[in-house]
Amino acid sequence: MKTVCAKDMCAGCMACINMCKKSAITIVDDYKTYNAVIDEVKCVNCGLCEKICPNVKCVEQVNPIFWKEGWALNPEIRSNASSGGIASSIIYSFIKNGGYVASCMLNKGEFVFELTNSTQRAEQFVGSKYVKSNPKTIYIDIERKLQEGKKVLFVGLPCQVAALKNFSRNQDNLYTVDLICHG
C-alpha cells in the first residue's frame, strides 16, 4: 500500500485529497489512525500531495505575531464556550470587520469545516471538539476567497494550519489560529 506520508503517521488534514486532480487518494480511517492511500493506477506521480503534506514538507517556522491568552468579556459568549470564548470573540470580530472564517462544526452527525461570513452561522463553531474532523474541500474554498482578495481566518489544529499554509499560494490575507491538539 503506497501512502502520501509514512504509514500510520497521517494527521488527517485531508489537504492531499484537495490537491490531487486525479482523485487518486483515499483516506483509510481506522479507530486510531488515518492513512492517505494512493491509488497507483490513477496516480500520475506529480508529487503535489507530498508537497502539501505537513508530515512530508514542514511549514516554514514563523514566530507568532503575538501570543496571548484570555477570555471573552461578553458573559453570554463565555458561558456558551468551552474555554472562555476567546476563539468565538476573535471569530465574531473578524466577521464584523468584513472577513470570512473557516472552522469546524457538527453538521448532520459529522464534524466538518465550513467557511462563512455570517456571525449567526459561526455560532455553530462554538465548543471543544475532541474528535476527528473532516476538512473536505475547505482548503479549496479558502484559496478561492483569498484569490478574490478577501480576508480569511482559519481556526483549526496545527496540522490543518500547516496543511493550509502548504496549500495556499495567496497568504497575504490569510490569518490562522492554531488550537491545542489532544490527538
Predicted segments with their positions:
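Iron-sulfur-associated redox domains of electron-transfer enzymes in respiratory
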Residues: 54, 60-183
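Short, charged amphipathic alpha-helical surface segments
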Residues: 41-42
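Conserved SAM-binding loop
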Residues: 12, 45, 153-154
